[in-house]
Amino acid sequence: MMAAERRIQPGELRHWEPMARYTSWRAGGPAERLYRPAGLADLVAFLRRLPEDEPLFWCGLGSNLLVREGGLRGTVILTQGGLDALRVEGEQVHAEAGVACGRLSRYCIRQGLAGAEFFAGIPGTLGGALAMNAGAFGGETWSRVRRVETVDRHGVLRRRGPEDFRVGYRHVSGPAGEWFVAAVLDLEPGDAQAMQARVKALLSQRNRTQPIGEPSCGSVFRNPPGDHAARLIEAAGLKGLRRGAAQVSERHANFIINTGGATPADIEALIEQVRDEVARRHGVTLVPEVHIVGEAQS
C-alpha cells in the first residue's frame, strides 16, 4: 500500500489529507494539516510549536462532522488512535479523549463497573461525547463526569470540574479556547454478565431500527422539546428523499446515508431541505447535531 493511501500514524503530520478517510459519512474535503498525536505529551509539544494564529479543529471518529469540499485551513488534531489511554482506579475510570465510546463501555463492563453501558450506543470518541453531552439508551455523558482535563492552544493542561461548564441536552459550554483531552468517570460495582446482556439487547434493538453499517453521522438533528426529529421528518414524508447520492434513510428518518459517492454538498443540501420542509409543515425548526465546517468548493 502506498504511503498516500494509508491512514495517518501516531506522531505523523500530513498536508492536504482527505478528511473523507476520517469521517463516518466517508465524504469530506482535505485538511491543510492533519496531525495524530502519539500521546498526550506529544500533543502538548506539538501545540507549543504552532503559530499563535493557526486555526485548530479537533476530530475523533468524525461521526458528527461534515467537511465541505474546499477543505479546512489550519490544523486538524486527530485524537482517535493517539489519545487512547484507559485505566481504572477503584470505582473511577480515567480515559483519554480519543477512546472510542464503544471501547470505553466494553472496558468498564470487563472491570465490573456499571454506569457506562450507554456509551456502547454513541458512535464517536469520549472527547466528542464530552463536547456535546452525547447520550444513548437513556444515559448522558456528563452524568458520570467527576472531572476533565483540557488543553489550550499553547499546550497548557488544566483540570476542571463539572462546575466549570454549562451542560444541557446535546450542548456543553465552558472556558473559551480549551479542548477536552481526558476525563475521570464515576461508576459503581456491577455484574459484568448482566451488563453485557443488557448492552447486547440494546444494540440488537438499535441495529433493527437504525441503518448501522451504512455511512452516516448518526442522528442528524437534535430532538426538539417534547418530540422526536425522526417522527417529524417521517410525518413530512421525507423518508427516502435524495440529493445526489445522499439519502434520508428508509429505516430511520433522522439518519442521512451516503449511498455511494455522495459529496459534502449533497449532504449539506439535503440537511437544509429536510430542515426547511419540517419547518414548513410542522412549524418546528430542527437544530443539527452535526458540525458543518470548511470552505465550499470554488
Swiss-Prot record:
EC number: 1.3.1.98
Gene3D superfamilies, alphabetized: 3.30.465.10, UDP-N-acetylenolpyruvoylglucosamine reductase, C-terminal domain, Uridine Diphospho-n-acetylenolpyruvylglucosamine Reductase, domain 2
Predominant subcellular localization, coarse grouping: cytoplasm
GO biological process: cell division; cell wall organization; peptidoglycan biosynthetic process; regulation of cell shape
Alphabetical list of PROSITE patterns matching this protein: FAD_PCMH
Needed co-factor(s): FAD
Top-level taxon of the source organism: Bacteria
Record pathway: Cell wall biogenesis; peptidoglycan biosynthesis
Active site positions, chain numbering: R170, S219, E289
Catalytic activity: UDP-N-acetyl-alpha-D-muramate + NADP(+) = UDP-N-acetyl-3-O-(1-carboxyvinyl)-alpha-D-glucosamine + NADPH + H(+)
Entry's localization field: Cytoplasm
HAMAP family cross-referenced by the UniProt entry: MurB
Similarity-based family: Belongs to the MurB family.
PANTHER family: UDP-N-ACETYLENOLPYRUVOYLGLUCOSAMINE REDUCTASE
Function of the molecule: Cell wall formation.
NCBIfam families, sorted: murB, PRK13905.1
Protein's name according to its UniProt entry: UDP-N-acetylenolpyruvoylglucosamine reductase
Originating organism: Alkalilimnicola ehrlichii (strain ATCC BAA-1101 / DSM 17681 / MLHE-1)
